[in-house]
Amino acid sequence: MRLSYVFVVFAASLLVTADTLSTNTGVQAANLVGPAQRLLRKHYTAAENDGDSEARALNPEKMKTMWKAGMTVDGYAAKLKLTDKIAAAANSAKAMEKLGETHKMKKLLRYLNYVAEHTAV
């Protein structure tokens, strides 16, 4: 009876050593033979993406002349053709968020902040 235990232990140790001695050929390693180009992510800024952004920018001088000429925020929204888009997006948070990411809406909000700062004084 004890001889059967010896055979079981011998068979188990044989199986364990057979698993440890087998090599895995499915592993692929990086080839480090020579220099290679690394593909890194590059994050572009708005200035890099848009070459003519300065020409379209709403700077303080333009806002000052618009304000002195009597341009209201609603009038500027109409000039940018945003009134219908704002009215359509008023009931949807997703639509308003998407509209807020546009260049025209950012210009309108910049002018709105300028007018709010200068009328409060």
UniProtKB/Swiss-Prot annotation:
<comment type="function">
    <text>Secreted effector involved in P.mirabilis colonization of host plants. May perturb the signaling of cell death associated with plant immunity, via interaction with a host MAP kinase.</text>
</comment>
<keyword id="KW-0732">Signal</keyword>
<keyword id="KW-1035">Host cytoplasm</keyword>
<protein>
    <recommendedName>
        <fullName>RxLR effector protein PexRD2</fullName>
    </recommendedName>
</protein>
<feature type="short sequence motif" description="RxLR-dEER">
    <location>
        <begin position="38"/>
        <end position="56"/>
    </location>
</feature>
<keyword id="KW-0964">Secreted</keyword>
<comment type="similarity">
    <text>Belongs to the RxLR effector family.</text>
</comment>
<dbReference type="GO" id="GO:0030430">
    <property type="term" value="C:host cell cytoplasm"/>
</dbReference>
<feature type="region of interest" description="WY domain">
    <location>
        <begin position="57"/>
        <end position="121"/>
    </location>
</feature>
<keyword id="KW-1048">Host nucleus</keyword>
<dbReference type="GO" id="GO:0042025">
    <property type="term" value="C:host cell nucleus"/>
</dbReference>
<dbReference type="Pfam" id="PF18488">
    <property type="entry name" value="WYL_3"/>
</dbReference>
<feature type="signal peptide">
    <location>
        <begin position="1"/>
        <end position="18"/>
    </location>
</feature>
<dbReference type="InterPro" id="IPR040691">
    <property type="entry name" value="PexRD2_WYL"/>
</dbReference>
<dbReference type="GO" id="GO:0005576">
    <property type="term" value="C:extracellular region"/>
</dbReference>
